[in-house]
Design a protein with these regions (language model features):
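Outer-membrane beta-barrel "beta-signal"
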Residues: 176-182, 244, 285-300
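Residue-level signature of outer-membrane beta-barrel architecture
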Residues: 60-64, 109-111, 150, 181, ...
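Transmembrane beta-barrel domains of bacterial outer-membrane proteins
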Residues: 24-133, 141, 233-236
Length: 300
């Protein structure tokens, strides 16, 4: 099974706080236009579908203080959520559901170990469901982890650790990895990998306007019951596009993205250990589609 973005708490959101003592809020809406549906062998099946999402979150620093090396010791609370509507037309229920809700709340703590290393610990829970009318205990997952972060250079951080969740109905420990690489100059380059893959190349046109080429791979999942069995429904997609961003106040900005969704897999997976570690070369998927999004963010 491909590990989706929501199997572990979004640890990387806390790293965005840095030494900022203010809250961060974001709201984003995405649209992927309709495209033909194909099986895992690439054969076109009857039907097509689109995807619409609303994604938002708030991160509140509860306590931040700096040590003697000017590195943060901090506690924070984060609440994030995504609602996705899958506009499936003439697609069998064997391949897709009509909606997904992923919502997480967590408490996070970071502290430096020395000048080169920090430790980040998280503890939280989330709801992962495709049935908003009846949210069962099986769709509520606990999650947490410990990540050791190495500050190799001022623009390069990497980390290793462990994550724990009850995605299979009982606690399991998984390895976790983190990478954040930034390059400045005429163009700003950023590569980030933890729960999702993010890539951007940006140019600051003036004090208020920034233009970027962006790419991201992300995923959603829900705990479902299918044919009397406990399963997960997984939707994973990636996109690349042009993103203009305009700062309308000191800490407030709006942005929009237009581009292409390169891939969007949708499939059901058994909620078992064997299925979790099983990985297919290809999954049932939608074809290449147009991608659009708009968003607003504060405090970033």
């Amino acid at each position: 099974m491909k590990q989706t973005a929501n199997l572990t708490l979004l640890i990387c959101v806390f790293l965005c706080l840095g030494n900022k003592a203010q809250a961060q809020v974001f709201l984003k809406s995405e649209y992927i236009s309709p495209s033909k549906f194909k099986d895992k062998n690439g054969n076109k099946l009857r039907g097509k579908g689109d995807l619409k999402t609303i994604d938002g979150g708030i991160r509140i620093p509860v306590c931040i203080k700096m040590d003697e090396n000017n590195k943060p010791i901090a506690w924070a609370i984060a609440l994030t959520g995504t609602y996705a509507s899958l506009g499936n037309k003439d697609i069998s229920k064997d391949y897709a559901t009509s909606e997904i809700l992923n919502a997480q709340v967590g408490v996070m703590h970071v502290r430096p170990l020395n000048e080169k290393w920090s430790i980040l610990a998280t503890l939280g829970a989330g709801i992962y469901t495709s049935n908003l009318d009846k949210i069962s205990g099986k769709s509520i997952l606990g999650q947490g982890g410990i990540l050791f972060i190495g500050h190799a250079k001022p623009n390069f951080d990497w980390g290793v650790g462990v994550a724990i969740n009850n995605a299979l109905g009982y606690p399991m420990i998984f390895p976790s990895f983190y990478l954040d690489w930034r390059l400045g100059g005429i163009y700003d380059f950023k590569l980030s990998m933890y729960d999702s893959f993010q890539l951007s190349l940006s140019s600051q046109i003036n004090d208020n306007f920034k233009l970027s080429i962006v790419g991201e791979s992300k995923g959603l999942m829900s705990a479902v019951e299918k044919d009397g069995k406990n399963m997960y429904f997984v939707s994973q997609y990636g996109y690349a596009g042009i993103q203009p961003e305009y700062k309308i106040a000191k800490d407030l900005a709006v942005y929009a993205t237009g581009g292409v969704s390169l891939t969007r897999d949708t499939y059901f997976q058994s909620r078992t250990l064997k299925a979790f570690y099983k990985s297919e070369d290809n999954y049932p998927h939608f074809g290449v589609s147009a991608y659009f999004s708009v968003g607003i963010k504060y405090g970033f």
